[in-house]
Amino acid sequence: MNRLLSLFALGGAVLLAGCVAPTAKPNDPYYAPVLPRTPLPAAANNGSIYQAGFEQNLYSDRKAFRVGDIITITLNERTSASKNAGSQIQKDSSANIGLTSLFGATPSTNNPFGSGDLSLEAGYSGERATKGDSKATQGNTLTGSITVTVAEVLPNGIIAVRGEKWMTLNTGEELVRIAGLIRADDIATDNTVPSTRVADARITYSGTGSFADASQPGWLDRFFLSPLWPF
């Protein structure tokens, strides 16, 4: 009996461990700063007015266009979602069978089990019903800024950026990660771009410590909210 209880406890612990969300780890090489692949050639002083080292247009701004350049992304994300679902199933059935004769003969009305006449009439009725309602709402807001580096410049001029920011506090650590694609036209003169203009954005905000632990439900709550709960 004790061995059976131990097996059930071990199985429950394994199932609950699968409900825990993975925690982001520091020093992910994917979000490491991207440095230029090759050093830029030294500008040749071949004239007092025109020099071959300057490749920018005369009327263009000095923006981040090369691999390894730095861009600041201002985070201004607000999302909200709501979902309602309801279902109701009901089934009623009934049947009555009335017979006055059986094979051409009328049955005897003598009831050996008590008073009253016997009858061939029969009937049944049944009723089944099920009803369910569910509702889920969620809202998130993320504001701030993060400075990333240019990881790649695509042939069509789209710039791929990615980066992360770790903040070590007294009660733990907080992490902000972002990766995505931006247009050169969306970059302001101070090399900033809003997060709403980042295509295919992958934004992660998580943390460790007492604050992060306090915002997580307990293991028993996760069990009741998981698909393992049969009701």
Swiss-Prot record:
Location of this chain's protein in the cell? Cell outer membrane; Bacterial flagellum basal body
Q: Where is the signal peptide?
A: 1-18
Name the Gene Ontology biological process terms: bacterial-type flagellum-dependent cell motility
Q: Which GO terms describe its molecular function?
A: cytoskeletal motor activity
Q: Any idea which UniProt keywords this protein has?
A: Bacterial flagellum, Cell outer membrane, Lipoprotein, Membrane, Palmitate, Signal
Q: Specify the protein's topology with respect to the membrane.
A: Lipid-anchor
Which residue windows are transmembrane per the record? none
- Positions with an attached lipid (N-palmitoyl cysteine) read C19
Q: One GO CC annotation, please?
A: bacterial-type flagellum basal body, distal rod, L ring
Role this protein plays:
Assembles around the rod to form the L-ring and probably protects the motor/basal body from shearing forces during rotation.
Q: How does it assemble?
A: The basal body constitutes a major portion of the flagellar organelle and consists of four rings (L,P,S, and M) mounted on a central rod.
Similarity remark:
Belongs to the FlgH family.
Could you tell me which HAMAP family the record lists for this protein? FlgH (MF_00415)
Its recorded name reads Flagellar L-ring protein
Question: Organism source for this protein?
Answer: Pseudomonas putida (strain W619)
